[in-house]
From Swiss-Prot:
PANTHER family: DELTA-1-PYRROLINE-5-CARBOXYLATE SYNTHASE, GLUTAMATE SEMIALDEHYDE DEHYDROGENASE. The keyword Lipid metabolism does not apply. It is an enzyme of class 1 (oxidoreductase). Its EC number is 1.2.1.41. It is found in: Cytoplasm. Pathway: Amino-acid biosynthesis; L-proline biosynthesis; L-glutamate 5-semialdehyde from L-glutamate: step 2/2. The gene is proA. The lineage of its organism: Bacteria, Bacillati, Bacillota, Bacilli, Bacillales. This is Gamma-glutamyl phosphate reductase.
Length: 415
Protein backbone atom coordinates (compact mmCIF):
# COMPACT_ATOMS: atom_id res chain seq x y z
CA UNK A 1 0.00 0.00 0.00
CA UNK A 2 1.36 3.43 -0.94
CA UNK A 3 2.11 6.10 1.65
CA UNK A 4 -0.85 8.16 0.44
CA UNK A 5 -3.35 5.30 0.74
CA UNK A 6 -1.98 4.19 4.09
CA UNK A 7 -2.06 7.62 5.70
CA UNK A 8 -5.43 8.52 4.20
CA UNK A 9 -6.87 5.32 5.70
CA UNK A 10 -5.47 6.25 9.11
CA UNK A 11 -6.95 9.74 8.78
CA UNK A 12 -10.35 8.30 7.86
CA UNK A 13 -10.36 6.14 11.00
CA UNK A 14 -9.34 9.16 13.06
CA UNK A 15 -12.11 11.27 11.51
CA UNK A 16 -14.68 8.79 12.80
CA UNK A 17 -13.29 9.38 16.30
CA UNK A 18 -13.00 13.14 15.88
CA UNK A 19 -16.71 13.57 15.24
CA UNK A 20 -17.38 12.41 18.81
CA UNK A 21 -14.93 14.80 20.50
CA UNK A 22 -16.15 17.71 22.59
CA UNK A 23 -15.09 21.31 22.20
CA UNK A 24 -13.21 21.09 25.50
CA UNK A 25 -11.26 18.06 24.30
CA UNK A 26 -10.36 19.77 21.04
CA UNK A 27 -9.28 22.95 22.81
CA UNK A 28 -7.14 20.94 25.22
CA UNK A 29 -5.34 19.40 22.24
CA UNK A 30 -4.79 22.82 20.68
CA UNK A 31 -3.21 24.04 23.90
CA UNK A 32 -0.90 21.04 23.88
CA UNK A 33 0.11 21.89 20.31
CA UNK A 34 0.79 25.55 21.16
CA UNK A 35 2.92 24.48 24.13
CA UNK A 36 4.76 21.95 21.99
CA UNK A 37 5.60 24.52 19.32
CA UNK A 38 7.11 26.78 21.96
CA UNK A 39 8.93 24.07 23.86
CA UNK A 40 10.40 22.42 20.78
CA UNK A 41 11.13 25.53 18.77
CA UNK A 42 14.87 24.81 18.69
CA UNK A 43 14.23 21.54 16.84
CA UNK A 44 11.81 23.20 14.44
CA UNK A 45 14.12 26.11 13.65
CA UNK A 46 17.07 23.76 13.11
CA UNK A 47 15.09 21.72 10.60
CA UNK A 48 13.79 24.89 8.95
CA UNK A 49 17.35 26.08 8.46
CA UNK A 50 18.03 22.93 6.42
CA UNK A 51 15.21 23.89 4.07
CA UNK A 52 16.46 27.46 3.78
CA UNK A 53 20.01 26.36 2.94
CA UNK A 54 18.73 23.82 0.42
CA UNK A 55 16.49 26.45 -1.14
CA UNK A 56 19.34 28.91 -1.54
CA UNK A 57 21.48 26.21 -3.12
CA UNK A 58 18.63 25.50 -5.56
CA UNK A 59 18.39 29.19 -6.45
CA UNK A 60 14.95 29.88 -4.97
CA UNK A 61 13.98 33.55 -5.17
CA UNK A 62 14.22 35.79 -2.08
CA UNK A 63 10.41 35.96 -1.90
CA UNK A 64 10.08 32.17 -1.76
CA UNK A 65 12.88 31.98 0.81
CA UNK A 66 11.00 34.54 2.89
CA UNK A 67 7.80 32.46 2.79
CA UNK A 68 9.83 29.40 3.70
CA UNK A 69 11.62 30.99 6.64
CA UNK A 70 10.68 30.45 10.26
CA UNK A 71 12.46 32.49 12.90
CA UNK A 72 11.74 32.58 16.62
CA UNK A 73 9.22 35.42 16.32
CA UNK A 74 7.32 33.80 13.46
CA UNK A 75 7.20 30.48 15.26
CA UNK A 76 5.96 32.06 18.48
CA UNK A 77 3.36 33.97 16.45
CA UNK A 78 2.18 30.63 15.02
CA UNK A 79 1.88 29.22 18.54
CA UNK A 80 -0.06 32.32 19.62
CA UNK A 81 -2.41 31.86 16.65
CA UNK A 82 -3.13 28.30 17.78
CA UNK A 83 -4.11 29.63 21.20
CA UNK A 84 -6.38 32.20 19.56
CA UNK A 85 -8.23 29.29 17.95
CA UNK A 86 -9.12 28.04 21.41
CA UNK A 87 -11.08 31.21 22.05
CA UNK A 88 -13.06 31.00 18.82
CA UNK A 89 -16.53 29.54 18.85
CA UNK A 90 -16.67 25.91 17.76
CA UNK A 91 -19.11 25.76 14.82
CA UNK A 92 -19.66 21.99 15.14
CA UNK A 93 -23.11 21.25 16.52
CA UNK A 94 -24.41 24.75 15.81
CA UNK A 95 -28.12 24.75 15.05
CA UNK A 96 -28.77 26.53 11.76
CA UNK A 97 -32.48 25.93 11.37
CA UNK A 98 -35.27 24.19 13.27
CA UNK A 99 -38.69 23.31 11.88
CA UNK A 100 -41.51 21.92 14.00
CA UNK A 101 -44.00 20.08 11.80
CA UNK A 102 -47.71 19.80 12.54
CA UNK A 103 -47.36 16.02 12.74
CA UNK A 104 -44.92 16.39 15.63
CA UNK A 105 -41.66 15.87 13.72
CA UNK A 106 -38.79 18.11 14.83
CA UNK A 107 -36.37 18.84 11.98
CA UNK A 108 -33.08 20.55 12.83
CA UNK A 109 -30.13 21.40 10.57
CA UNK A 110 -26.78 21.40 12.39
CA UNK A 111 -23.13 21.87 11.47
CA UNK A 112 -20.93 18.77 11.35
CA UNK A 113 -17.27 18.17 10.37
CA UNK A 114 -16.40 17.63 6.71
CA UNK A 115 -14.47 14.46 7.59
CA UNK A 116 -11.00 14.12 6.04
CA UNK A 117 -9.53 17.31 4.59
CA UNK A 118 -6.65 17.11 2.12
CA UNK A 119 -4.28 20.07 1.95
CA UNK A 120 -1.80 20.49 -0.90
CA UNK A 121 0.40 23.55 -0.63
CA UNK A 122 3.73 25.12 -1.48
CA UNK A 123 6.71 26.38 0.54
CA UNK A 124 4.76 27.74 3.52
CA UNK A 125 5.52 25.88 6.78
CA UNK A 126 2.99 28.02 8.64
CA UNK A 127 0.23 26.41 6.56
CA UNK A 128 1.18 23.05 8.07
CA UNK A 129 0.17 24.25 11.52
CA UNK A 130 -2.68 26.49 10.37
CA UNK A 131 -4.37 23.73 8.38
CA UNK A 132 -3.89 21.05 11.01
CA UNK A 133 -5.19 23.10 13.92
CA UNK A 134 -8.16 24.54 12.01
CA UNK A 135 -9.16 21.02 11.02
CA UNK A 136 -8.79 19.74 14.57
CA UNK A 137 -10.87 22.61 15.95
CA UNK A 138 -13.69 21.69 13.56
CA UNK A 139 -13.52 17.96 14.28
CA UNK A 140 -11.81 16.97 11.04
CA UNK A 141 -8.80 14.84 10.26
CA UNK A 142 -6.26 16.24 7.81
CA UNK A 143 -3.83 14.85 5.24
CA UNK A 144 -1.07 17.35 4.53
CA UNK A 145 1.05 17.36 1.40
CA UNK A 146 3.53 20.25 1.33
CA UNK A 147 6.34 20.95 -1.09
CA UNK A 148 9.82 19.46 -1.19
CA UNK A 149 11.19 22.92 -0.37
CA UNK A 150 9.75 22.73 3.16
CA UNK A 151 9.97 19.01 3.86
CA UNK A 152 12.32 19.20 6.88
CA UNK A 153 10.20 21.94 8.46
CA UNK A 154 6.96 20.08 7.81
CA UNK A 155 8.23 16.80 9.24
CA UNK A 156 9.38 18.61 12.38
CA UNK A 157 6.13 20.53 12.80
CA UNK A 158 3.94 17.46 12.31
CA UNK A 159 6.06 15.39 14.70
CA UNK A 160 5.63 18.08 17.35
CA UNK A 161 1.87 18.21 16.76
CA UNK A 162 1.56 14.42 16.92
CA UNK A 163 3.44 14.30 20.21
CA UNK A 164 1.07 16.98 21.49
CA UNK A 165 -1.96 14.98 20.36
CA UNK A 166 -0.56 12.03 22.30
CA UNK A 167 -0.96 14.12 25.45
CA UNK A 168 -4.59 14.87 24.62
CA UNK A 169 -7.79 12.92 24.05
CA UNK A 170 -7.70 13.37 20.28
CA UNK A 171 -6.40 10.59 18.00
CA UNK A 172 -2.77 10.98 16.96
CA UNK A 173 -3.68 9.88 13.45
CA UNK A 174 -5.93 12.91 12.93
CA UNK A 175 -2.90 14.70 11.45
CA UNK A 176 -1.04 13.00 8.59
CA UNK A 177 1.86 14.28 6.48
CA UNK A 178 2.72 12.84 3.08
CA UNK A 179 6.52 12.90 3.19
CA UNK A 180 6.93 11.81 -0.42
CA UNK A 181 6.64 15.11 -2.31
CA UNK A 182 6.82 13.63 -5.80
CA UNK A 183 4.23 14.50 -8.44
CA UNK A 184 2.88 10.98 -8.12
CA UNK A 185 1.64 11.54 -4.55
CA UNK A 186 -0.12 14.71 -5.64
CA UNK A 187 -1.87 12.83 -8.43
CA UNK A 188 -2.96 10.14 -5.96
CA UNK A 189 -4.55 12.77 -3.74
CA UNK A 190 -6.40 14.26 -6.73
CA UNK A 191 -8.35 11.04 -7.21
CA UNK A 192 -8.62 9.76 -3.64
CA UNK A 193 -12.40 10.05 -3.50
CA UNK A 194 -12.73 7.19 -1.02
CA UNK A 195 -10.19 8.73 1.35
CA UNK A 196 -10.72 12.49 1.16
CA UNK A 197 -13.92 14.47 1.57
CA UNK A 198 -12.42 17.68 0.20
CA UNK A 199 -9.10 18.89 -1.20
CA UNK A 200 -7.83 22.42 -0.57
CA UNK A 201 -4.90 23.85 -2.57
CA UNK A 202 -2.86 26.73 -1.12
CA UNK A 203 -0.27 28.30 -3.37
CA UNK A 204 0.28 29.98 -6.70
CA UNK A 205 -1.92 30.00 -9.77
CA UNK A 206 -0.20 27.03 -11.42
CA UNK A 207 -0.76 24.77 -8.42
CA UNK A 208 -4.37 25.83 -7.96
CA UNK A 209 -5.19 25.45 -11.65
CA UNK A 210 -3.61 21.98 -11.66
CA UNK A 211 -5.67 20.81 -8.68
CA UNK A 212 -8.93 22.25 -10.04
CA UNK A 213 -8.30 20.74 -13.47
CA UNK A 214 -7.24 17.23 -12.44
CA UNK A 215 -8.93 16.52 -9.10
CA UNK A 216 -11.98 14.28 -8.91
CA UNK A 217 -12.13 14.97 -5.17
CA UNK A 218 -14.30 18.04 -4.42
CA UNK A 219 -12.04 21.11 -4.32
CA UNK A 220 -12.30 24.20 -2.14
CA UNK A 221 -10.51 26.58 -4.46
CA UNK A 222 -8.29 29.14 -2.76
CA UNK A 223 -7.72 31.19 -5.86
CA UNK A 224 -4.68 33.00 -7.12
CA UNK A 225 -4.49 36.70 -6.43
CA UNK A 226 -4.10 38.86 -9.53
CA UNK A 227 -5.58 41.76 -7.56
CA UNK A 228 -6.11 45.27 -8.96
CA UNK A 229 -6.45 48.82 -7.70
CA UNK A 230 -8.21 51.23 -10.04
CA UNK A 231 -7.52 54.94 -9.46
CA UNK A 232 -10.53 56.87 -10.72
CA UNK A 233 -10.39 60.43 -12.05
CA UNK A 234 -11.59 61.93 -8.74
CA UNK A 235 -9.32 59.94 -6.43
CA UNK A 236 -7.51 61.90 -3.72
CA UNK A 237 -3.80 61.85 -4.68
CA UNK A 238 -2.48 61.44 -1.14
CA UNK A 239 -4.88 58.62 -0.30
CA UNK A 240 -4.22 56.92 -3.63
CA UNK A 241 -0.49 57.00 -2.99
CA UNK A 242 -0.81 55.53 0.49
CA UNK A 243 -3.25 52.79 -0.53
CA UNK A 244 -1.35 51.69 -3.64
CA UNK A 245 2.02 51.62 -1.88
CA UNK A 246 0.53 49.62 1.00
CA UNK A 247 -1.31 47.22 -1.29
CA UNK A 248 1.85 46.48 -3.28
CA UNK A 249 4.82 46.85 -0.96
CA UNK A 250 3.75 45.89 2.56
CA UNK A 251 4.13 42.20 1.70
CA UNK A 252 4.40 41.56 -2.05
CA UNK A 253 4.50 37.76 -1.76
CA UNK A 254 0.94 37.26 -0.48
CA UNK A 255 -2.20 36.68 -2.50
CA UNK A 256 -4.00 39.87 -1.41
CA UNK A 257 -1.20 42.17 -2.57
CA UNK A 258 -2.01 43.93 -5.83
CA UNK A 259 -0.32 42.80 -9.03
CA UNK A 260 -1.88 45.37 -11.37
CA UNK A 261 -2.66 49.08 -11.15
CA UNK A 262 -5.22 50.75 -13.40
CA UNK A 263 -5.18 54.55 -13.60
CA UNK A 264 -7.69 56.91 -15.18
CA UNK A 265 -5.85 58.64 -18.02
CA UNK A 266 -6.57 62.16 -16.71
CA UNK A 267 -5.44 61.27 -13.18
CA UNK A 268 -2.29 59.72 -14.63
CA UNK A 269 -1.36 62.94 -16.45
CA UNK A 270 -1.97 65.08 -13.36
CA UNK A 271 -0.64 62.88 -10.55
CA UNK A 272 0.77 59.70 -12.05
CA UNK A 273 4.40 60.74 -12.35
CA UNK A 274 4.76 61.25 -8.60
CA UNK A 275 3.07 57.95 -7.68
CA UNK A 276 5.08 55.95 -10.21
CA UNK A 277 8.28 57.52 -8.93
CA UNK A 278 7.33 56.62 -5.35
CA UNK A 279 6.76 53.00 -6.36
CA UNK A 280 10.10 52.87 -8.17
CA UNK A 281 11.85 54.31 -5.11
CA UNK A 282 10.24 51.53 -3.05
CA UNK A 283 11.96 48.99 -5.27
CA UNK A 284 8.92 48.07 -7.36
CA UNK A 285 9.61 47.11 -10.98
CA UNK A 286 6.94 48.72 -13.15
CA UNK A 287 5.67 47.17 -16.38
CA UNK A 288 3.41 49.64 -18.10
CA UNK A 289 1.72 50.78 -21.27
CA UNK A 290 3.11 53.60 -23.43
CA UNK A 291 1.70 56.35 -21.21
CA UNK A 292 3.21 54.83 -18.08
CA UNK A 293 6.59 54.34 -19.75
CA UNK A 294 6.54 58.02 -20.78
CA UNK A 295 5.68 59.19 -17.27
CA UNK A 296 8.22 56.91 -15.58
CA UNK A 297 11.35 56.25 -17.69
CA UNK A 298 12.40 53.34 -15.46
CA UNK A 299 9.22 51.43 -16.28
CA UNK A 300 9.45 48.54 -18.73
CA UNK A 301 7.05 48.03 -21.61
CA UNK A 302 4.35 45.59 -20.48
CA UNK A 303 3.64 42.47 -22.50
CA UNK A 304 0.27 40.75 -22.80
CA UNK A 305 1.27 38.15 -20.20
CA UNK A 306 1.86 40.87 -17.59
CA UNK A 307 -1.83 41.76 -17.35
CA UNK A 308 -2.70 38.28 -16.08
CA UNK A 309 0.42 37.63 -14.02
CA UNK A 310 0.49 36.85 -10.31
CA UNK A 311 4.04 37.99 -9.57
CA UNK A 312 4.13 37.47 -5.77
CA UNK A 313 7.12 39.81 -6.00
CA UNK A 314 7.85 43.57 -6.14
CA UNK A 315 6.65 43.82 -9.74
CA UNK A 316 3.55 45.75 -10.79
CA UNK A 317 1.79 46.02 -14.14
CA UNK A 318 0.33 49.49 -14.73
CA UNK A 319 -2.21 50.52 -17.37
CA UNK A 320 -4.12 53.70 -18.12
CA UNK A 321 -7.85 53.47 -18.89
CA UNK A 322 -10.45 55.91 -20.17
CA UNK A 323 -13.07 55.35 -17.48
CA UNK A 324 -14.41 53.03 -14.78
CA UNK A 325 -16.17 50.88 -17.37
CA UNK A 326 -12.89 50.11 -19.12
CA UNK A 327 -11.29 49.35 -15.75
CA UNK A 328 -14.05 46.85 -14.96
CA UNK A 329 -13.73 45.20 -18.38
CA UNK A 330 -9.98 44.81 -17.86
CA UNK A 331 -10.48 43.26 -14.41
CA UNK A 332 -13.14 40.89 -15.69
CA UNK A 333 -10.75 39.74 -18.42
CA UNK A 334 -7.58 39.34 -16.36
CA UNK A 335 -8.61 39.19 -12.70
CA UNK A 336 -8.82 36.07 -10.56
CA UNK A 337 -11.99 36.93 -8.59
CA UNK A 338 -9.98 37.55 -5.43
CA UNK A 339 -9.75 41.18 -4.24
CA UNK A 340 -10.28 44.35 -6.28
CA UNK A 341 -10.35 48.02 -5.26
CA UNK A 342 -11.51 51.37 -6.59
CA UNK A 343 -10.16 54.67 -5.28
CA UNK A 344 -12.63 57.45 -6.00
CA UNK A 345 -14.64 60.30 -4.51
CA UNK A 346 -17.47 59.57 -6.94
CA UNK A 347 -20.12 57.51 -5.14
CA UNK A 348 -21.81 56.43 -8.39
CA UNK A 349 -18.53 55.12 -9.80
CA UNK A 350 -17.82 53.29 -6.55
CA UNK A 351 -21.27 51.67 -6.55
CA UNK A 352 -20.91 50.67 -10.20
CA UNK A 353 -17.48 49.14 -9.60
CA UNK A 354 -18.52 47.21 -6.49
CA UNK A 355 -21.58 45.83 -8.27
CA UNK A 356 -20.01 45.02 -11.63
CA UNK A 357 -16.73 43.49 -10.48
CA UNK A 358 -16.98 39.75 -9.82
CA UNK A 359 -14.64 39.09 -6.90
CA UNK A 360 -14.72 37.67 -3.40
CA UNK A 361 -13.85 41.07 -1.91
CA UNK A 362 -14.42 44.46 -3.59
CA UNK A 363 -13.08 47.59 -1.88
CA UNK A 364 -13.83 51.30 -2.06
CA UNK A 365 -11.00 53.55 -0.85
CA UNK A 366 -9.08 50.85 1.02
CA UNK A 367 -6.16 48.48 0.48
CA UNK A 368 -6.74 44.93 -0.74
CA UNK A 369 -4.38 43.76 2.00
CA UNK A 370 -7.36 43.53 4.37
CA UNK A 371 -8.69 40.37 2.70
CA UNK A 372 -7.88 38.10 5.61
CA UNK A 373 -9.88 36.13 8.14
CA UNK A 374 -8.47 37.96 11.15
CA UNK A 375 -8.82 41.40 9.54
CA UNK A 376 -12.45 40.69 8.65
CA UNK A 377 -13.19 39.54 12.18
CA UNK A 378 -13.75 35.91 11.18
CA UNK A 379 -10.79 34.64 13.18
CA UNK A 380 -8.43 32.12 11.63
CA UNK A 381 -8.79 31.05 8.00
CA UNK A 382 -7.92 27.98 5.95
CA UNK A 383 -7.56 30.09 2.81
CA UNK A 384 -9.35 32.66 0.67
CA UNK A 385 -11.91 31.12 -1.66
CA UNK A 386 -12.56 32.63 -5.07
CA UNK A 387 -15.27 30.15 -6.03
CA UNK A 388 -18.98 30.58 -5.43
CA UNK A 389 -20.08 27.21 -4.06
CA UNK A 390 -19.78 26.26 -0.38
CA UNK A 391 -17.66 29.25 0.65
CA UNK A 392 -16.32 32.51 -0.79
CA UNK A 393 -13.73 34.92 0.55
CA UNK A 394 -11.71 34.22 3.72
CA UNK A 395 -12.74 30.75 4.87
CA UNK A 396 -13.00 30.57 8.64
CA UNK A 397 -14.03 27.65 10.81
CA UNK A 398 -17.60 27.31 9.42
CA UNK A 399 -16.14 26.65 5.94
CA UNK A 400 -14.62 23.43 7.30
CA UNK A 401 -18.04 22.07 8.19
CA UNK A 402 -20.97 20.59 6.34
CA UNK A 403 -24.53 20.15 7.54
CA UNK A 404 -26.64 17.28 8.80
CA UNK A 405 -30.39 17.21 9.33
CA UNK A 406 -31.52 15.67 12.61
CA UNK A 407 -35.15 14.49 12.68
CA UNK A 408 -36.86 13.51 15.91
CA UNK A 409 -40.25 11.89 16.09
CA UNK A 410 -42.43 9.53 18.12
CA UNK A 411 -43.51 6.98 15.54
CA UNK A 412 -44.64 9.19 12.65
CA UNK A 413 -45.13 7.50 9.26
CA UNK A 414 -45.64 9.09 5.86
CA UNK A 415 -49.04 8.54 4.29
Amino acid sequence: MSEVLQKAALAKEAAAEMVMKTTAEKNEALQCIADGLRNERRLILTENQKDIEAGRNRGLTPDIIDRLTLDEKRLLDIADAVELLIGLEDPVGESLETIQKENGLSIEKIRVPLGVVGMIYEARPNVTVDAATLCLKTGNAVVLRGSSSAIHSNIALVSVMKRALGLSKLPIDAVQLIEDTSKETAKQLFTLNDGLDVLIPRGGKNLIDLVVRESTVPVLETGAGNCHVYIDESADPQMASEVVINAKTQRPSVCNAIESLLIHEKWAEEHGRKLLNQLTEKGVELRGDQVICRLEPQAKQAEEADWGAEYLAPILSVKTVQDVQEAVRHIQQYGTNHSEAILTENAEHAAYFQTAVDAAAVYHNASTRFTDGFEFGYGAEIGISTQKLHARGPMGLPALTSTKIIIKGNGQIRV
